[in-house]
Amino acid sequence: MAIHIENLKIEQFRGIRQLSVPHLNHINLIVGDNNCGKTSFLEALLLLRDPGDFTNTLRIARMRDSLAMYGGISAYESLLTLFPHNSNEAETARMLSLQARCRGEDVLYSLEGNVKTIMLDAEEQNRIPRYSIRNFRKFKDSIPSECQAFQGNLLVRTGNNQEKTEIRFHEYSTVSGRDITNRHLLNIVYLAPFDHLRGGNFSRILTNDPYKELCVQILQLFDPGITDLLMLKNENTNRPIECVKHKELGIMPLSSYGDGIKKVLSIASGIARAVDGVLLIDEVETAIHSRYFEDIFRFIASACRKFGVQVFITSHSIEAIDGFLSIVDYEKTTGQEDPISVVTLKKDWSSSLSYARVLSGCHVHQNREQFGFEVRL
């Protein structure tokens, strides 16, 4: 079983405060009430992908705004949304912090600083995209000489190594053109609830014939006539088209199929990209009918074990939770290592603190069968 992240403590990240999960597993089902922090939990894990790269932090901050074609907030505003509001701190103070144990090493991530008003020199003024939609009305005929900015330090400690980087990011800064270090601590892949609508899921699947055959078998749950996955070029545009070969209909573009097939292919591609790393699946049940849960989840568990992938999965659906628990025959595996943990998140709104209850899959399965245990609360 792949367990690359052994434990996690989120000191502060978005709406999560003082959340401790002392033991993580190969398959981690993250559940809880609305607004308890399930998606934020996955985003915090993404900080461990490349903790010393501030661009990685900005990329995480921008993820929720990625589908907004118009009217999205600025990169600076996105960054500020990562910091939880704390009435006990000075109004300008900001801090993100988490600790984890990854592959036997202790890891610390801490971004701490203040929001303040700064002067913009002539060089920085000239770099402001004054004709962008967001800034056009604001600037009109004048260029701002001052603005709001976050100034602080990013501290990262991995084992005995420590790195401290000075950070300065103001309200007219952009993400475009920033350096990407690619010093990945962990290979972490995140799948948003609607990533399957973006396309681009074939490339990793097609390079591995045995894995492609396994994916085709899963797709046959939806349509028994599917026999192959192909990538063809459009004769007019020369652009690649993701296609499905059908024994009766011939070659069909993937776009002609429903969201369920696209969702399964998105997950399959995510597993292939997360080899020897971590896969984060947000709202796994999206676009999948409950009658397919057990077969698809069995595929996820099998493929993740094969490729050495630790997986974290959020869900609102009790049927999805039961579907995952059903892939293990707990009546016959008594005493064996349980690959599944169910992590229930809960937020105390009076203290703003977050809590986690971690139960084994076997414990939840038995209590679901005997008492109808509601694990999501």
Annotate each language-model stretch with its function.
Residues 51-272, 278, 341-377:
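Phosphate-coordinating catalytic segments in nucleotide- and nucleic-acid-processing enzymes
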Residues 1-55, 251-376:
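Switch/communication elements of ASCE P-loop NTPase nucleotide-binding domains
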